[in-house]
Amino acid sequence: MTDSLSLDHFSMLDVDQAPESPGLYAWYVSFRAGPHDWKIKPSADGDQAIEGFLNLLRKYAGYYEPLPIDLSGRGSYGAKWEGSLELDFPLREPTEGAQTSDDDSLQRLDTLMDSLDTEERRRVMATILQKASPVFSTPLYIGVATNLRERLRKHRLDYTRAHDWLRDHPEDTEAIRARGKSFGQRAAARSIAMEHLEAWVIDLADEENDEVTKKHLRNTAESAEWLLHRLYSPILGRQ
């Protein structure tokens, strides 16, 4: 038995290179920005790159936005109460008629805007966020597989089919975002680019021996998956 498990990572574009062995895996989305995003874009209204970079942050934050929670209850005389609660999620695009955020949130937004005020500050912000995944970030999805390559390929196929469907049927986006049956479908519905998705895998092939059979490995991996779901609450998990 080895002293340490094998850990590796693959872009969704490259999952054909994943090992054909049992293991655990987690999907992450990386933040992508380049000089064209942080360099100054002069205009009559000032530097357009500030708003452009803020929109880039909003899009990235939106990948992690939880779905609304449905609530229901009963009152006196059989009255029924129903509704949903949405998290006051940071950086959400303001909508007309929406309630104004509290003073603390507005102050934090002002501080954020100051950190995007110059080309160099935007570059530093981009570098921090690019380095943060996966070290500081919560996974989008955690899974267990008997054959890692086969499972990751299935995720890619689900993503591709959902992406192609939504291109022609954009009206189905919210339904798939909320009730998509697979990680690939839900990721496509959140408009996450395939090339931004990366799977980190724990390969258990070297752990198999006379005392730890493939069945034992699967059971152990499933127990670890159950625990990791409850610790990290991956936003695109089965829940």
Feature locations, PLM:
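Boundary/linker segments flanking structured domains
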Residues: 1-239
